[in-house]
Amino acid sequence: WVANLTGVANQTGIESGTGVIGFDTGPGNALMDDYMRLYCDADFDKDGALAASGIADATLVETWLDERYFTTGWPKSLDRQAFRHRLDDTRLLTKVPADAMASLALFTANSIAAAIDQLPASPKTILIAGGGRRNLCLLSHLQNRFGSAVQGGNIVGDRLLFSPDMLEAELMAFLAARHIAGLPTSFPAT
C-alpha cells in the first residue's frame, strides 16, 4: 500500500478480491505549507520540527474530520485547495504557530488514517512517498496509529527500486507510455 504525501494525500494499493484501489485521502502538505508561508515566512516546516514542538488541538481536529469527504467511500478525488478554508478557522488562528502546525499535522495524519480504516483490510505495509515523508511529526502520528506497517525514508525506496521523491514523476511517465501504446491508464476503482 502506498500513501503519497504531496499537496494532496493519496493512496494506492492492490486488495485481494477488490483489485486496484486509489483515491485522494485529504490534505497532504498543502495546509501545513500554506500556513508556513502565510504566518511563518517559510515555505514548509522542515522535518516537521515546528509541528513537533507544539500541542495539537485534538478537539478541533475531530470537528474538521466530521466533513463529509472523510466518510465518503472511494473512488474520490479533490484539489489542493479543498480544505484551504481551515486556515481561516479562528480556532486555528488564535493559536501560536507551533500549536497550529501541530493541529494541522494531526488533521493530515488522522485524515490519512481514516482513509486507511475504510479499506477492506488493514494493509500490512504502508509505504510513505512524497515530500510529506520528511515531516517527522506527520510520520510519528502515522506510526503511532499503524505501528511498524508505516515505512518511510530512502531505505524503503531503495529496496523497492523506486524513489519515494520521484513517485509522481515516475507514475506520469508510466501513464504516458501506456497512453502512447493505446493501453488503459486507469482502473474502475481508481
Regions found by a protein language model. Name each.
Residues V2, Y39-F44, A115-L119, A177-F187:
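Short helix-capping/linker segments at secondary-structure and domain boundaries
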Residues L106, D158-T190:
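Glycine-rich phosphate-binding/hydrolytic loop that grips phosphoryl groups
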Residues P123-R145:
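Glycine-rich phosphate-binding loops at beta-strand->alpha-helix junctions
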Residues V150-I155:
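Generic structural signal for residues in well-ordered beta-strands
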Residues W1-L5, A9-I14, D33-D34:
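Short beta-strand scaffold segments in enzyme catalytic cores
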Residues I21-A109, A113, T185:
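Conserved ATP-utilizing enzyme core subdomain
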Residues T94, A113-K124:
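Phosphate/pyrophosphate-binding loops at sites that engage ATP/ADP/AMP, CoA/4′-phosphopantetheine
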Residues N4-V8, G26-G28, I128-L136:
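A short acidic Gly-Thr/Ser loop motif
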